[in-house]
UniProtKB/Swiss-Prot annotation:
Keywords: Antimicrobial, Disulfide bond, Fungicide, Plant defense, Secreted, Signal
Signal peptide coordinates: 1-25
CC annotations in GO: extracellular region
Family per similarity comment: Belongs to the DEFL family.
One GO term (biological process): killing of cells of another organism
Annotated S-S bridges: 30-66, 36-57, 42-64, 46-65
Top-level taxon of the source organism: Eukaryota
Species, as recorded: Arabidopsis thaliana
Protein name as it appears in the record: Putative defensin-like protein 89
Intracellular or extracellular location(s): Secreted
Length: 89
């Protein structure tokens, strides 16, 4: 009975860790099978993969989840076209 409660708690925690960053404009990409001991281990794992926002260690799930920003800069959506068109009558 205790194992089932612990498993449910871990499932809810993993779900919350994935859902909350999505609401704030971030998402997470999780990598299973990573033997992590703390968040620093996951930061070292995430940074070379262009996940500069870091990551979190889910020890019980044996995985690292890296924060991935999904909000794009407004500047990148602007047109870079600098051609001026003059219309004369």
């Amino acid at each position: 009975m205790g194992f089932k409660n612990n498993l449910s708690l871990v499932s809810v925690m993993v779900f919350a860790l994935i859902l909350l960053p999505m609401i704030s404009g971030q998402t997470m990409q999780c990598y299973s099978g990573i033997a992590c001991t703390d968040d620093g281990t996951c930061n070292d794992y995430c940074n070379p993969r262009n996940n500069n926002l870091g990551g979190v260690c889910l020890r019980r799930a044996n995985c690292c989840c890296c924060y991935v920003s999904v909000v794009k800069s407004q500047e990148s959506s602007l047109s870079k076209d600098t051609n001026n068109v003059f219309i004369t009558n």
